[in-house]
């Protein structure tokens, strides 16, 4: 009788302040894109699990919203609670910081991490953007004094530099356990959720600085069609009439571009043809209303 192969499985939280590259790191660790990215802070609003299975190892990464001090709006409070609760019951935390920058938000995150029982790996992202490399070593020494890190790894998530080192450390700290997900799973999120995230990413990419924090997307219809693809109806919610005009653009040009780009990404992700229709609606005060936020899928509970 042959011996049953041991399997290893663990949860790894990716945390840090907004806009340090957490989602880019997750996508690179998975080898494909499941978490939306942009150059704007607070792109990630929900916790997203990314699942990477390789042989006997299954790493379940939890990409969290950026932790930040500002909590004036209900959406910011929910994002902070979602990020904080993600680090409570994991095998390993990857704390992502940006180059030689250190802010009050970074300090707040490390204060939360000091009380954890699990090991914390520090990933210094965007080191390729540090122009004065002589500042890097002193900064690494400064960071190493903040708490007892498992290891400190300089990386460039965007270029894939040293991401394999992160993955290797993750494997070494996975407990022996059954896999939680089938080996072909890459995320715990539904196709409907991923469709809304793709549309939101395009909104952030093609619109101005102010709008992204006042916009969300609700998928009203996601149904298979007779051609083997999907009919998807997306409702874009904004807070003011002026924002609605901004999303639609001159003679509908902006929403058309957003729709084309989103449809292409959906077809690549779902491996099927997509018929996408988008509408824009004004819903005043949605980002300040916790009940409305929860109805739109914002939550501080792991799903």
Curated annotation (Swiss-Prot):
One of its GO terms (biological process) is ribosomal small subunit assembly. Residues 207-284 form the KH type-2 domain. It is a peripheral membrane protein. One of its GO terms (cellular component) is cytosol. Its main location: cytoplasm. GTP binds at residues 16-23, 63-67, 125-128. The keyword Cytoplasm applies. Residues 16-23 are annotated as: G1. Residues 42-46 are annotated as: G2. Residues 63-66 are annotated as: G3. Residues 8-176 form the Era-type G domain. Monomer. An essential GTPase that binds both GDP and GTP, with rapid nucleotide exchange. Plays a role in 16S rRNA processing and 30S ribosomal subunit biogenesis and possibly also in cell cycle regulation and energy metabolism. PANTHER family: GTPASE ERA (PTHR42698), GTPASE ERA, MITOCHONDRIAL (PTHR42698:SF1). This is GTPase Era. It comes from Yersinia enterocolitica serotype O:8 / biotype 1B (strain NCTC 13174 / 8081). The gene is era.
